[in-house]
Each structure stands twice: as C-alpha cells, then as structure tokens.
C-alpha cells in the first residue's frame, strides 16, 4: 500500500500526510491504510479549491491554471494540510476578519463567497452514515459538511453542494480511479474495511454497574443522572458567551471575560522591608569542612569517631568570642554551648574507649538554647469552659522582607562543580531490554554531569543530617545528644574522604505526631565573615573560634574561622522528606529525559548520545534581567538539580502557594505566546493570590523575581 500511495499521489501531498501522521504519533509503515486515507482526503480538499476564484464583482468563477487572470482572489482558504498551530492561527485570523464563529474542531476549508467553514469527508462506507457521524461530532450549524464516496455518491448540508457539477464530477472521477487502481493491486478490500467512524470516547466506553452508580452519585447539584450532565456538558460552548454560562452555573458568579494581551500582565509586586535572611536547616555555600582522606582509623564509619578524627586535623583553635550577636538571644549561652562541646569532646578523648554516641550534660545554657521547660503548659479544654474571656493568643503577622542578592549567589553556587564526587549509583544488574539499555545510558550521562555538583553535596549532607537526627530523636528521646554533621565523598583521584561540617545538639524529642517539633542547636564551621552581610545571618550568633591556613596562588595565608550557632527545629515529617532528598536527582533526570524524548520524536531516533556529546549546542537554562540564559547540557542538568534541591531545602507553605498560583499566570502567558487568544476573568484576584505568598521567604522571593524577568522577555 505504501508503494501505491507514493506512486499514485503528488509528492507534496505524500509529504504533508507523512507530517500529519508524525504529529499524531502514528507509523505510516504500520498504518498504511490510514496513510492512503489521509492522502486521498488532502487531494480532495485541494481539488475542491483548485481553479475557483472570486472576481471583482464578488462572483465565483472557474479559471484554468494558464489563464492570465489567475491573480484573482482565491475563493477557498485551505486549512487542511497545515500543522495544527498554523491551522488554528489561520482559523483565528479568518474569524477576526470575517466575524465568523470560531469552530470547535479544525475545519478543512473556508469559503469566502458563502462566508462559511467547510468540513470535507471522504468515506468508503454509506455517505449518509458518515454524514451523520460528522454532524454529530461537529454539532455546529455554521460549518458546512460535504461528503464524497468512492462510489460516486455525495451528500452535503441542506443539499447545498457549493461547487458546480463539473468540479464535483472531477473529484468523483479521481476517487473512482483511486478505487480501481487499489482493486487492481488487491488493496481495495483491506482499505474499505479499515475505515473507523467518527467515534468519541464516550461512545466507545459504556459505564455500567458500580462505576455507573458512583457516577450518578457524584454529579453536581441539579443533575439527576449522568446522561443529563453529559447533555449539558456537550451543549456547553467553550467559545460562546462564557459570562452567561458562569451565571447559569451559580447565581453568585458574575465574571466578565477580558482578552489577555501583551500589555495586560504587570510585574508581580515584591514586598518592601528589611532584607530576607538565611533560613535553611544547615549552611550551604558558607559551610566549611574539616576533612580526612582515606580514613582508616579505629571505629571508622562511627560518626563520633569520624568527627573526633576530623577535629584533630585542625590546629588553629583559639579562645572563642562573639563577633556577631543574635539580636534577640542570650548570646553568652551560645558561646558557653560551644565551649561545652569542646570540653566534652576532650573528655571523650581522655577515656580509654570512645563511646558510639555522646549525650551532653543538661547545662543551663543548653536548656535555654533547646527551649527546655519553655513550652506553655497544656490544659484540658473541658477544664477551661467556664473562663469567660478564653481566647486563642494573638500571633503577630510575619514581617515583610525584601529580596536580597545573597539567595541568587547561593543558587549560582549550588549549580557549580566541586572537586569531589558526591554520588555513586549502585550497579543494578545487566540491561536486558533495549529500553533498559537506553535508561542506563541516560542515567550514566546524567550522573557524570551532576556527581561533582555542589547541589549534590547538599543532597548527601541533607540526607545524612536528617537521618541522624531522626534516629537520635527516636533512640534517645530525653537526651541532649551530640550529632556530628558529616558527609562522605571521593576525590577526583578516587580516594575516599570524610568531612565534618560541625555539630548538632538535639533537645527532648517525644515525637508522637508527624508535625511535633524537636528543637536542636546547630554549630557549623565557616570562613565567611558574618559582618559582610549581617542581614543574612539575623537568626545566628557567630563566634570566631580559630585561624585557618589557606593555600592560595600567592602562597599560604591565615583566615579567621567562624562558628555559626543557632537554635532551630524540625519535625518527623520534615526529617522524613529530608532523608529522601535523593529524589531531587530523579526529578531533574526526568525533566532532562522529557527534553531528550521531545528531540528523539522529532528526529525519529534516540538522541541521548547526541544530546550529551554535542558540546557545541546550547540550551535555555532560565530567565535573567539580561534575557534567556543559555548553557551546555551539563549546565542545564545542574541548574534543574539545584532548583529541585532548593525546593526541598526551602520547602514552605509560601513556596507551595506561589508555585500553584503563579503556574496559572504562566499558562495564560504561554497560551498568548502560542497565539491561542486567551481570556481571563478576575486577573486582579490571581495577582492577589500570588502576592499574598510573597512574605519573607528568600527562595520564593527569588522565584518571583525570575518570574518577572520571564514576563518581561516573553511578552516583547
């Protein structure tokens, strides 16, 4: 059949049919009858239009190709054969210029003389059956239907055949010739039997039994059964008077649909106020590690043993003092807490055998820092019923904060490469099926791009800290346990490395519910001077605890070493998600995979290798005030990973709300870019919903700023 089609039809028609099948994901090597049907339909549409013009008096005339008057206006606009986006653009343009009602489905032609869209049908069955199917699907009196069959029959709306008899006879003769040619090659019977009707999903699937009863019970008010609701939905014109439809649905709804134009959207308003502060559970770009390479000490792998070994690598300890106090805290208590950690670690080293875990003495400074006995007493509600002025205590509205540059710097740093390898994916057996081979290849390429990434370090650090804290919270509920903040990696040469970032001391942790809070004090090493960006460190008390020799291009230099101390809290559910931060790798890999799939479907072959090995190609990474930023595929992988990791590190209700609400605006803007002529109602309400999520969260504020950059460049 494929050979017949290529011989029988004009190469341009064959090419258009191939494109159409590719657009719908159909294989012309398998669906050969469909290939023939599409070519036939295209040819009939072109023949319908051929030689028909409108003269200066507005009359329809037939003019042969070589006629010198062929510069007359074409009577028919051909819509069939264009890709969907262009076809809808043509339809929208016709509707705008002629005032014609926009059809629900893409028609085949537009008749400028009769001012109507035309749906052409070519059937191998009875013309009246096919006509009814078309009419039932289109459900519009404004689209004219004209059906031709291979037997010479035809049927049209109100028996109005549009064209003169000679033009229609030419089409019928061509269809009869195609049928004869197919029959001569033994292809006709298969072609005739392969035609499917204009079915809809509802006609194919009957809902019966329990599902039917559930459907009848689940209807909106005022509908007695599924049929009534279906009839209402089928008659609901999406491009009709939406305002009227909304008022039908509810008396409270009163909406005016406004066209959404390039000039309609305004930037999202970011809050004013003091700069936002760092609120992650551990330091990110400012963290400093004390490391040991190729650890082989006694008890290697036991966190406390590893921590003591890492602490011994540093010789620049000095008497600690406060360099940046916490505005609201009792700062001497933070200083005393660090001194207590040093003293108790020294005590451990003096013991014959180092214990596996260390519970801190419950000193006054730790009790204060961990909020011991600070929780208000819980009283049974029944005992309070008689108190006349019983009310919930007033809570202050959170203070609005403005966007600060440090969060963009944090994100940029998270996308960078480090000199260590942070993940090694386990071997998962031989690839058997081709899909497994492709999946492994993609995973390996992706891993190579992100294994050195700083965002991957944050994942492993987050997994370790949350796992250790949850374990300690369950195993030592009443103890102030000392938990080293550790990560493990490999150097570029493949040597194992253990890193210590600092310590956590956890408070009492009787966690019954998922949201019950465990308090902890974090103490983290850093070389960042807090006085450079004091607003970032609002929640911290920062001590100077030593001097570190740093090797640089100009030789060794001494830098002060700081300890960032703060009180913090988390819950079982937050720790559970923190332990699963490796999911971020999967999410970003899936995003990359969808890019590869899109490219592969266009090129009709797996593009994984080309994608990762074509170093000259650049891809869009994101928006900045300068415009669309582009980079290598590796940069795209690392940026997507960093976004996913930051969504985890800075998870909050503000982020949930902003993501959900801004997505609605994003979809409308994308519809505008795709020339789909979107309309909106209560756009002000949508902006309000977006902006009420912009309070004080640094990551949400940065995302809002990125969104504004996107709006600026998307609507140019």
From Swiss-Prot:
Its cofactor is Mn(2+). A motif (Nuclear localization signal 1 (NLS1)) lies at residues 124-139. Binds 2 manganese ions per subunit. InterPro entries: INFV_PA, PA/PA-X, PA/PA-X_sf. Keywords: Cap snatching, Endonuclease, Eukaryotic host gene expression shutoff by virus, Eukaryotic host transcription shutoff by virus, Host cytoplasm, Host gene expression shutoff by virus, Host nucleus, Host-virus interaction, Hydrolase, Inhibition of host RNA polymerase II by virus, Manganese, Metal-binding, Nuclease, Phosphoprotein. It is found in: Host cytoplasm; Host nucleus. It is an enzyme of class 3 (hydrolase). One of its GO terms (molecular function) is metal ion binding. Its EC number is 3.1.-.-. A motif (Nuclear localization signal 2 (NLS2)) lies at residues 184-247. Plays an essential role in viral RNA transcription and replication by forming the heterotrimeric polymerase complex together with PB1 and PB2 subunits. The complex transcribes viral mRNAs by using a unique mechanism called cap-snatching. It consists in the hijacking and cleavage of host capped pre-mRNAs. These short capped RNAs are then used as primers for viral mRNAs. The PB2 subunit is responsible for the binding of the 5' cap of cellular pre-mRNAs which are subsequently cleaved after 10-13 nucleotides by the PA subunit that carries the endonuclease activity. Belongs to the influenza viruses PA family. This is Polymerase acidic protein. It comes from Influenza A virus (strain A/Memphis/1/1971 H3N2).
């Amino acid at each position: 059949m494929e050979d017949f089609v290529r011989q029988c039809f004009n190469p341009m028609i064959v090419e258009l049919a191939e494109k159409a099948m590719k657009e719908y994901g159909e294989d012309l090597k398998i669906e050969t009858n469909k290939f023939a049907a599409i070519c036939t339909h295209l040819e009939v549409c072109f023949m319908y239009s051929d030689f028909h013009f409108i003269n200066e008096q507005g009359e329809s005339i037939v003019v042969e190709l070589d006629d010198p008057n062929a510069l007359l206006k074409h009577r028919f606009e051909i819509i069939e054969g264009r890709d969907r986006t262009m076809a809808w653009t043509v339809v929208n343009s016709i509707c705008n210029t002629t005032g014609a009602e926009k059809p629900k489905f893409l028609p085949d032609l537009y008749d400028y003389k009769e001012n109507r869209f035309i749906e052409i049908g070519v059937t191998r069955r009875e013309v009246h059956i096919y006509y009814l199917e078309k009419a039932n699907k289109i459900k519009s009196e404004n689209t004219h239907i004209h059906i031709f069959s291979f037997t010479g029959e035809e049927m049209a709306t109100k028996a109005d055949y549009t064209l003169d008899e000679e033009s229609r006879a030419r089409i019928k003769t061509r269809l009869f010739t195609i049928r004869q040619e197919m029959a001569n090659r033994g292809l006709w019977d298969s072609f005739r039997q392969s035609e499917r009707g204009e079915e809809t999903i509802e006609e194919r699937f009957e809902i019966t039994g329990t599902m039917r009863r559930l459907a009848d019970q689940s209807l909106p008010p005022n509908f007695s059964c599924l049929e009534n609701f279906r009839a209402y939905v089928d008659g609901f014109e999406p491009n009709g008077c939406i305002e009227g439809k909304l008022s039908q649905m509810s008396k409270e709804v009163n909406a005016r649909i406004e066209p959404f134009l390039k000039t309609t959207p305004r930037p999202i308003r970011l809050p004013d106020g003091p700069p936002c502060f760092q609120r992650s559970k551990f330091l990110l770009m400012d963290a400093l590690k004390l490391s040991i390479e190729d650890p082989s000490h006694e008890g290697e792998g036991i966190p406390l043993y590893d921590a003591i070994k890492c602490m011994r690598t540093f010789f620049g300890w000095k008497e600690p003092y406060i360099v940046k106090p916490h505005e609201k805290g009792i700062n001497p208590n933070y200083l005393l807490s660090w001194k207590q950690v040093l003293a108790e670690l020294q005590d451990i080293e003096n013991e014959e055998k180092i214990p596996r875990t260390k519970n801190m003495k419950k000193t006054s400074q730790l009790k204060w820092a961990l909020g011991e006995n600070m929780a208000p007493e819980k009283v049974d509600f029944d005992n309070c019923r008689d108190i006349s002025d019983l009310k919930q205590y007033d809570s202050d509205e959170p203070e609005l904060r403005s966007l600060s540059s440090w969060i963009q710097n944090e994100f940029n740093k998270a996308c960078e490469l480090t000199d260590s390898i942070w993940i090694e994916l386990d071997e998962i057996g031989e690839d058997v099926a081709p899909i497994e081979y492709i999946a492994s290849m993609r995973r390996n390429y992706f891993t190579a791009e992100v294994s050195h990434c700083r965002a991957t370090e944050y994942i492993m650090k987050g997994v370790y800290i949350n796992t250790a804290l949850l374990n300690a919270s369950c195993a030592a509920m009443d103890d102030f346990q000392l938990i080293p903040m550790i990560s493990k990696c490999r150097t570029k040469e493949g040597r194992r490395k253990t890193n210590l970032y600092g310590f956590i001391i956890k408070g009492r942790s009787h966690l019954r519910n998922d949201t019950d809070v465990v308090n902890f004090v974090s103490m983290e090493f850093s070389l960042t001077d807090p006085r450079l960006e004091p607003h970032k460190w609002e929640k911290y008390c920062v001590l100077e605890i030593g001097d570190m020799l740093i090797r640089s291009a100009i030789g060794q230099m001494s830098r002060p070493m700081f300890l960032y101390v703060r009180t913090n809290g988390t819950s079982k559910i937050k720790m559970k998600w923190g332990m699963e931060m490796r999911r971020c790798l999967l999410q970003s890999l899936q995003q990359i995979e969808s890019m590869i799939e899109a490219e592969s479907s266009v090129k009709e072959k797996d593009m994984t290798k080309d994608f990762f090995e074509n170093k000259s190609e650049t891809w869009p990474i994101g928006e900045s005030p300068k415009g669309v930023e582009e980079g290598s595929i590796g940069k795209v992988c690392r940026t997507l990973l960093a976004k996913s990791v930051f969504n985890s590190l800075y998870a909050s209700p503000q982020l949930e709300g902003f993501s959900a609400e801004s997505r609605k605006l994003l979809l409308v803007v994308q519809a505008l870019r795709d020339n789909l002529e979107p309309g909106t109602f209560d756009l002000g309400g949508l902006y309000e919903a977006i902006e009420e999520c912009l309070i004080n969260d640094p990551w949400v504020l940065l995302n809002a700023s990125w969104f504004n950059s996107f709006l600026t460049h998307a609507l140019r």
